[in-house]
Amino acid sequence: SGKKVDAWMGIPYAQPPLGPLRFRHPRPAERWTGVLNATKPPNSCVQIVDTVFGDFPGATMWNPNTPLSEDCLYINVVVPRPRPKNAAVMLWIFGGGFYSGTATLDVYDHRTLASEENVIVVSLQYRVASLG
């Protein structure tokens, strides 16, 4: 549509759930110093990638499109440009039955929602499957 958005991807909301934090509740993210590089989509949380239906677009479009990692607790924010004064904020929590999924799938293109519906879209990665 030619409409513009601003996007911040991969903002940590919790400490990486590694080592002794693996099976614990998420701990608040530690402060960072300087400027956070929020220009690339975050890792997808560890999960079993579905290969039952083969390698065709209708099936693979639901498979993670970013690297799988236990370091995956991040949010993404997409805002229409120019920035609206009183926009609604939509929190997008992807489905997947706590078994699989990721907020970064191309079918969940937040830019379209933000630009066409004039809403601020926030999405998050969360642990799924055996680590969820």
From Swiss-Prot:
> Gene of origin?
ACE-1
State the SUPFAM superfamilies in the record.
alpha/beta-Hydrolases (SSF53474)
- Catalytic activity field: acetylcholine + H2O = choline + acetate + H(+)
Q: Which species is the source of this protein?
A: Culex quinquefasciatus (Southern house mosquito)
* Glycosylation sites (chain numbering): 37
Write down the top EC class of this protein. Answer: hydrolase
**What is the organism lineage in this UniProt record?**
Eukaryota, Metazoa, Ecdysozoa, Arthropoda, Hexapoda
Highest taxon in the source lineage: Eukaryota
Q: How does it sit in the membrane?
A: Peripheral membrane protein
Cysteines joined through disulfide linkages: 45-72
InterPro entries listed in its UniProt record: AB_hydrolase_fold, AChE-related_enzymes, CarbesteraseB, Carboxylesterase_B_CS, Cholinesterase
Q: What is the name listed in the Swiss-Prot or TrEMBL entry for this protein?
A: Acetylcholinesterase
Please tell me where this protein is predominantly located: other
